């Protein structure tokens, strides 16, 4: 039987693009781990993706994951759009390169051994873990320490 893990994620960007951060909380039984990091120049969508990626990459064995995000971009991208992108060699339906392809590919890899249920929650609606992730992400965005090497303006 796989371990059942809950993951809560959020991304934040002060300006878009601008300094950004992500926050994630992993919960297994009564154990909890909080993750966050800030980037000097990025976008909100990249930080939403990073929150999910880093949280999944933190897991050390195959798990059954309930991943909660307030990002429709992440949820729809990973449950719907990614299948077409992969069929079209990471191009959109109108043959343009997929935005944030580096992170979509990394997320696809991070899912690997896990069974992930992607659950959308309304942001800024009083959901305690989402509020905590938002605070982690905003705090990290306010004190960025890393460069988002995959971000390209435009």
Swiss-Prot record:
Co-factor requirement: Mg(2+)
GO cellular component labels: cytoplasm
One function term, GO molecular function aspect: magnesium ion binding
Binding residues annotated for Mg(2+) 2, in chain numbering: 10, 134
Record field: catalytic activity: Endonucleolytic cleavage to 5'-phosphomonoester
GO biological process, one term: DNA replication, removal of RNA primer
Subcellular location, record wording: Cytoplasm
PROSITE patterns in the record: RNASE_H_1 (PS50879)
Keywords: Cytoplasm, Endonuclease, Hydrolase, Magnesium, Metal-binding, Nuclease
Gene3D superfamilies associated with the record: Ribonuclease H-like superfamily/Ribonuclease H
Pfam families from the UniProt entry: RNase_H
Binding-site positions, Mg(2+) 1: 10, 48, 70
Cofactor binding notes: Binds 1 Mg(2+) ion per subunit. May bind a second metal ion at a regulatory site, or after substrate binding.
Domain RNase H type-1 span(s) in chain numbering: 1-142
EC number: 3.1.26.4
Ribonucleoprotein is among the record's keywords: no
InterPro entries linked: RNase_H, RNaseH-like_sf, RNaseH_domain, RNaseH_sf, RNaseHI
NCBIfam families in UniProt: PRK00203.1
The protein's role, per its UniProt record: Endonuclease that specifically degrades the RNA of RNA-DNA hybrids.
Family: Belongs to the RNase H family.
Description of how the protein assembles with itself and partners: Monomer.
Name of the protein in question: Ribonuclease H
Species for this entry: Edwardsiella ictaluri (strain 93-146)
């Amino acid at each position: 039987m796989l371990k059942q893990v809950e993951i809560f994620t959020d991304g934040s960007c002060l300006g878009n693009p601008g300094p950004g951060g992500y926050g994630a909380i992993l919960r297994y039984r009564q154990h909890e781990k909080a993750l966050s990091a800030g980037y000097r120049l990025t976008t909100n969508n990249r930080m939403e993706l990073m929150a999910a990626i880093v949280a999944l990459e933190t897991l050390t064995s195959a798990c059954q994951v309930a991943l909660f995000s307030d990002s429709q971009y992440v949820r729809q991208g990973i449950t719907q759009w990614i299948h077409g992108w992969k069929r079209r060699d990471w191009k959109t339906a109108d043959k343009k390169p997929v935005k944030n392809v580096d992170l979509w590919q990394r997320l696809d890899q991070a899912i690997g051994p896990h069974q992930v249920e992607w659950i959308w929650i309304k942001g800024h609606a009083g959901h305690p873990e989402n509020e905590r992730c938002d605070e982690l992400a905003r705090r990290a965005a306010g004190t960025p320490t890393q460069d988002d090497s995959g971000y390209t303006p435009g």
